[in-house]
């Protein structure tokens, strides 16, 4: 499983797709005059590093890390950034950033109760959760469990077809695969 996750995190078209999702969320928020405070989370630090650097280098928004081993003062500085790059472990611990209203889950996970709860606990802040669904059997099964949780909580689920172009060996033709969707949960939880 860890090898599959590693390869998933290193797949360049997927990483670029995630950056484009972040850009789209920020643009839509600006167009609708919605203030977004975004947390991007993953298990794997390599994808977090990639996303942090891409966001910074493309000047998408202010960005900072929220990962284990950081000093308290550095975590506080990161809390003021528009985009917070964090591990699932840090997002599930004593995280209490009241202004967070957007979550982008970049790696699959079965139990998202605590993570999603961080975003959805404050009513009226236009909460948005983006849950990226990957097509491998194992990851699809994890999605089914997350979807059951979302349905149980009566979150509104909207599907967005991905715009990632993938072919043999990662280049070429477009894949039209039901499993490769982003799910958005809006005003509840957007997948």
Walk through the language-model features, giving the residues of each.
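Active-site catalytic pocket residues across diverse enzymes, especially alpha/beta-hydrolases
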Residues: 26-29, 55, 59, 119-123
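Structured helix-beta-strand junction loops
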Residues: 28, 34, 58, 80-81, ...
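C-terminal helicase lobe
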Residues: 3, 126-185, 189
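Short phosphate-engaging motifs
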Residues: 14, 47, 111-112
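Conserved interdomain hinge at the start of the Helicase C-terminal
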Residues: 1-40, 50
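Conserved helicase motor "Helicase C" RecA-like lobe of SF1/SF2 P-loop NTPases
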Residues: 34-70
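Conserved RecA-like P-loop NTPase helicase motor core
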Residues: 68-156
